[in-house]
């Protein structure tokens, strides 16, 4: 099994190009089921993308892959979909597999999807997915670990209020509603840029969607959608991760290929800590200026601070000049990186959904183990900050969400190798 060897202590200097957003491309790939052909560009080279390709092919899709140096193009032909079951063997690898449920159900009137897998960071129940589809008229039962869904005729657009903000359920609801009969109005929706990107793709396909980027989305169902081409937006989580990498290594890095407005909440939090962050043409520049203040943080649905960057921010706070309180409001059990950071000399105490981080002068290298995707990269950031050697095990998580991570960091001076 591969591992990463990191020799820290070098400030990162240079520029990093950001890849396409994983959390946007996966639902957009699922949206291909709604039409006959979808051409997607700026597709990142990630194992989760490969898993979604395998899933779509299992349903009967034909996928042409055009490989470029830094991205894929995908041409997904779904006119011959003939299998409506998403098997456990594929779905267990990735929670995003559940996003085929809405498209299969709304277009074909039936779908059978295994209960999903993915990172081990909490229950992340599918109740809201099921509730909104039932409100559209679907009949749904859970049997033997599968969601069995069917409808008599077309789904019908409801007025539906999500009990809590759910990115995943918002996506499934939108994917189902674009072909449902009548008007769907969804309240308390996720507002994430990746949801906006999905909606923009669907509009390119001919969907009628209003309220994009707000908590109230209105969709007028169409009889069918068109073939289309669409470029996926850049990954704000990847961008934020490298912004924190620049800060924790006392570096100076230009993050390129990202719209500043979708990373502005990250930039503002870094500025609070004393890091210099300025917008540049097609990106942002992050520069350490000699101090790192302790800052409290709460994760919240967008435009709040992303839970997917909580672990990276915690790594930064381990070296701050004071005490910070980090509150995780999205997922339970998302502090699994804490024991590993403590192995490296961090002073962190977890109390329920809160972590108290007391800054130390320096972390030290150690052998550590990744528990999930975002935890793994937080340990890399910690390793880069030390003046010694860190060995990171179970790095297969990284390839689910970060393209060419070692290469991008090495190009900025990091000593990091996969062995």
Curated annotation (Swiss-Prot):
Cellular localization per UniProt: Cytoplasm
Entry's Gene Ontology molecular function annotations: UDP-N-acetylglucosamine 1-carboxyvinyltransferase activity
Keyword Cell wall biogenesis/degradation among record annotations: yes
Pfam family, one: EPSP_synthase
Positions bearing 2-(S-cysteinyl)pyruvic acid O-phosphothioketal: 119
EC number: 2.5.1.7
Catalyzed reactions: phosphoenolpyruvate + UDP-N-acetyl-alpha-D-glucosamine = UDP-N-acetyl-3-O-(1-carboxyvinyl)-alpha-D-glucosamine + phosphate
Principal location class: cytoplasm
Top-level taxon in the UniProt lineage: Bacteria
Active site positions, chain numbering: 119
Binding site for UDP-N-acetyl-alpha-D-glucosamine: 95, 164-167, 308, 330
Enzyme class: transferase
Keywords of the record: Cell cycle, Cell division, Cell shape, Cell wall biogenesis/degradation, Cytoplasm, Peptidoglycan synthesis, Pyruvate, Transferase
Biological process terms in GO annotation: cell division; cell wall organization; peptidoglycan biosynthetic process; regulation of cell shape; UDP-N-acetylgalactosamine biosynthetic process
InterPro entries to which the protein is assigned, alphabetical: Enolpyruvate_Tfrase_dom, Enolpyruvate_Tfrase_sf, MurA_subfamily, RNA3'P_cycl/enolpyr_Trfase_a/b, UDP_GlcNAc_COvinyl_MurA
Metabolic or biological pathway, per its Swiss-Prot or TrEMBL entry: Cell wall biogenesis; peptidoglycan biosynthesis
NCBIfam families in the cross-refs: murA (TIGR01072), PRK09369.1 (NF006873)
PANTHER family, alphabetized: UDP-N-ACETYLGLUCOSAMINE 1-CARBOXYVINYLTRANSFERASE
Function of the molecule: Cell wall formation. Adds enolpyruvyl to UDP-N-acetylglucosamine.
Record family assignment: Belongs to the EPSP synthase family. MurA subfamily.
Protein's name in the database: UDP-N-acetylglucosamine 1-carboxyvinyltransferase
Source organism of this protein record: Rickettsia peacockii (strain Rustic)
